[in-house]
């Protein structure tokens, strides 16, 4: 798993000799009907909009991240339809690696939860099982390609823990909603770790918004 910052909306507006920050652009657009639109102070404004649920202003700025994950987790991410995505395609490129999942026990009281309480021998068995499945499936995948079978067909042999990469672009509003859902304990651990890493990047670029959300 890896999350990498790619891009952020860059305002071209300059106020009092200083370029407007992405957060400043949110406030600038929020004040579209105000004669005080170029007010450089926006902390209280953003706090107010978050507190009162005026979310539309947070659609004025986008952030793009690169996410490296697996074919098991990618569909969960792609389910967030307010984002725009570009994903690594196994129709055109070859699979080269897999991600080893840790063995966790199913929580019988909560189907959305799993428990990290297996003994080391069970964890070792699960790691070895994943390695064996990858080795065999990747061998057959390579054989299929060597026989001239199209990548779009050969990829069906590969397991769900095959590594993939995608770009995820969304507005600040979309990211806020994504974090509220996917940083929660109800989210699968592997996906939650991605969301937490993404939120850490978000907090760096939107400190005022993050503080208002009490992150």
Curated annotation (Swiss-Prot):
GO biological process: dTMP biosynthetic process; dTTP biosynthetic process; methylation
Binding site for FAD: 56, 79-81, 87, 177
Short sequence motif named ThyX motif, residue ranges: 79-89
GO molecular function, one term: flavin adenine dinucleotide binding
Enzyme class: transferase
Catalysis performed (reactions): dUMP + (6R)-5,10-methylene-5,6,7,8-tetrahydrofolate + NADPH + H(+) = dTMP + (6S)-5,6,7,8-tetrahydrofolate + NADP(+)
Named cofactor requirement(s): FAD
Ranges for domain ThyX: 1-215
Swiss-Prot/TrEMBL keywords: FAD, Flavoprotein, Methyltransferase, NADP, Nucleotide biosynthesis, Transferase
Keyword Flavoprotein: yes
Binding site residues for dUMP: 76-79, 87-91, 155, 182
InterPro entries, sorted: Thymidylate_synthase_ThyX, Thymidylate_synthase_ThyX_sf
Pathway assigned to this chain's UniProt record: Pyrimidine metabolism; dTTP biosynthesis
EC number annotated for this UniProt entry: 2.1.1.148
Function in brief: Catalyzes the reductive methylation of 2'-deoxyuridine-5'-monophosphate (dUMP) to 2'-deoxythymidine-5'-monophosphate (dTMP) while utilizing 5,10-methylenetetrahydrofolate (mTHF) as the methyl donor, and NADPH and FADH(2) as the reductant.
Family per similarity comment: Belongs to the thymidylate synthase ThyX family.
Record-given protein name: Flavin-dependent thymidylate synthase
């Amino acid at each position: 798993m890896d999350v990498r910052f790619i891009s952020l909306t860059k305002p071209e507006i300059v106020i009092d000799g200083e370029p407007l920050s992405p957060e400043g652009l949110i406030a600038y657009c929020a004040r579209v009907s105000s004669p005080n639109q170029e007010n450089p102070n926006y902390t209280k404004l953003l706090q107010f909009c978050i507190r009162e649920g005026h979310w539309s202003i947070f659609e004025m700025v986008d952030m793009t991240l690169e996410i490296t994950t697996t074919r098991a987790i990618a569909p969960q991410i792609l389910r967030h339809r307010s984002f725009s995505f570009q994903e690594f395609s196994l129709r055109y490129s070859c699979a080269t690696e897999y991600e080893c999942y840790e063995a966790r026990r199913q929580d019988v009281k909560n189907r959305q939860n799993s428990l990290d309480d297996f003994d080391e021998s069970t964890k070792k068995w699960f790691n070895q099982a994943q390695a064996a499945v990858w080795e065999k499936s990747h061998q057959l995948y390579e054989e299929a390609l060597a026989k001239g079978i199209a990548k779009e067909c050969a990829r069906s042999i590969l397991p769900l823990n095959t590594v993939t990469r995608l770009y995820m672009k969304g507005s600040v509003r979309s990211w806020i909603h994504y974090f509220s859902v996917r940083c929660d304990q109800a989210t699968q651990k592997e996906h939650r770790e991605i969301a937490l890493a993404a939120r850490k990047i978000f907090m760096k670029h939107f400190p005022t918004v993050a503080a208002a959300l009490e992150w």
